[in-house]
Amino acid sequence: MKAFTQHTGLVAPLDRANVDTDQIIPKQFLKSIKRTGFGPNLFDEWRYLDVGQPYQDNSKRPLNQEFVLNHERYQGASVLLARENFGCGSSREHAPWALDEYGFRSVIAPSFADIFFNNSFKNGLLPIILSDEEVEELFKQVEANPGYQLTIDLQAQAVTRPDGKVLHFEIDAFRKHCLLNGLDDIGLTLQDGEAIKAFEGKHRAAQPWLFRDA
């Protein structure tokens, strides 16, 4: 998993509340068991004018020019600004996979659905909760200032605006540790690799009948 320490990136404003996981990555794209290939279909029903299908050549599909991610000024955005209850709906880890592969490192919103919130941390995507007032002010500033960037410092738990104002956010200490060090569930387990090997060795010696090759 990619570590997250500090990031400065262009902000794209998604001015919609209650964005659910089927809108983030529609159900027809969930057939793949790989973690890659979802970025081109992020917000598929909003980005394109036709109905997308798996393994389709998206370069030939008609774009919805009114959708924010298709605007020239937001090309290359790596911070998504959203409204309340982002990531609601059914549980699908493909949602943070799609956001990550598109290029987003963080999503800022007043609130998130619990499962999406948890899945994001496990996949290197930082969800940041700010107050309604702070988010509203960010929407106004992004709209008024092309090329608007934010700097996110995870260690300091701070979001710095271009005008120098700092917005602080809360994060669980364990999740912070994992993101700073790029540790997903597998990475955490592998930290105890030697202890696991030692236990397995003792277990095999004490109960050899449990192992076919003993």
From Swiss-Prot:
Q: In which pathway does it act?
A: Amino-acid biosynthesis; L-leucine biosynthesis; L-leucine from 3-methyl-2-oxobutanoate: step 2/4
Q: What is its EC number?
A: 4.2.1.33
| Catalyses which reaction(s) | (2R,3S)-3-isopropylmalate = (2S)-2-isopropylmalate
Protein family: Belongs to the LeuD family. LeuD type 1 subfamily.
Query: Mind telling me which PANTHER family this protein's record contains?
Result: 3-ISOPROPYLMALATE DEHYDRATASE SMALL SUBUNIT, 3-ISOPROPYLMALATE DEHYDRATASE SMALL SUBUNIT 2-RELATED-RELATED
Q: How does the record describe its quaternary structure?
A: Heterodimer of LeuC and LeuD.
Q: What is this protein called?
A: 3-isopropylmalate dehydratase small subunit
Give the source species. Answer: Pseudomonas putida (strain W619)
